[in-house]
Design a protein with these regions (language model features):
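Pre-Walker A (Motif I) flank of P-loop NTPase domains
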Residues: 55-61, 87, 157
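Conserved P-loop
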Residues: 62, 71-139
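Conserved glycine(s) of the Walker
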Residues: 68
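Loop/turn-to-beta-strand initiation segments
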Residues: 87, 139-142, 156-159, 183-188
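Interdomain "pre-motor" coupling segment immediately N-terminal to P-loop NTPase/helicase cores
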Residues: 1-26
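Conserved RecA-like ASCE ATPase "motif II neighborhood" in helicase/translocase motors
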Residues: 140-161, 165-175
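Pre-Walker A adenine-sensing motif
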Residues: 40-55
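Conserved P-loop NTPase nucleotide-binding/switch module
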Residues: 95, 100-106, 168, 172-193
Length: 193
């Protein structure tokens, strides 16, 4: 820890000289959505995410809102699950917008957090038929949880996406990055702006 300076980290995160192999998987469809729509990289940066995930176990996808970072990551996770490369998908976000007012909302914790986690559910609904998605969620093959729930876990045989990583504290990010176990892929998305 604390081996790289802030400037070195910034340089590594903003580097744009990643070589793309045009013959690789980044140009092919990732998968077919429930409506039959082909889900594939639509931009150079989405292809970079695919290429990076194929070469690395941990990828930081940094860019403005609405550029497909999370959607591309979730599509890659669903593909890995379908191909039996992983046993589960874990999607997480820091629940900062939910703040301390959760206790005043009606329902259990899931009811309180679901609106904040809705963008993740929306992406999954595009890619997995409703009944199968329901079963995956019930069986915890797909888990959607706030970042605080990752503490103390070791995540093996999983595809894990931390969405909205810019909203984490230093200690939350450190805690998350140390959860990686065997045969696990991590994608951390964020918007530095």
């Amino acid at each position: 820890y604390d081996i790289l300076s802030d400037n070195e980290i910034e340089t590594l995160l903003t580097k744009s000289d990643l070589e793309l192999d045009t013959s690789n998987e980044s140009h092919k469809p990732i998968l077919h959505g429930v409506s039959g729509r082909v889900i594939k990289a639509r931009t150079l940066n989405q292809r970079k995410i695919i290429d990076s995930v194929m070469k690395n176990d941990m990828v930081f996808a940094i860019g403005p809102a609405g550029t497909g970072k999370t959607y591309t990551g979730i599509a890659l996770a669903v593909k890995a699950l379908k191909n039996k490369n992983v046993k589960k998908i874990i999607l997480t976000r820091p629940a900062i917008e939910a703040g301390e007012n959760l206790g005043f909302l009606p329902g259990d914790l899931k009811d309180k957090l679901d609106p904040y986690m809705q963008p993740l559910y929306d992406s999954l609904k595009d890619m997995i038929p409703a009944e199968k998605l329901k079963k995956y969620l019930e069986d915890e093959v797909i888990q959607i949880a706030p970042l605080a729930f990752m503490r103390g876990r070791t995540l093996d045989h999983a595809f894990v996406i931390l969405d909205e990583g810019q909203n984490t504290t230093h200690s939350e990010m450190k805690m998350f990055l140390t959860r990686m176990g065997k045969n696990t892929k991590f994608i951390i998305t964020g918007d530095p702006g």
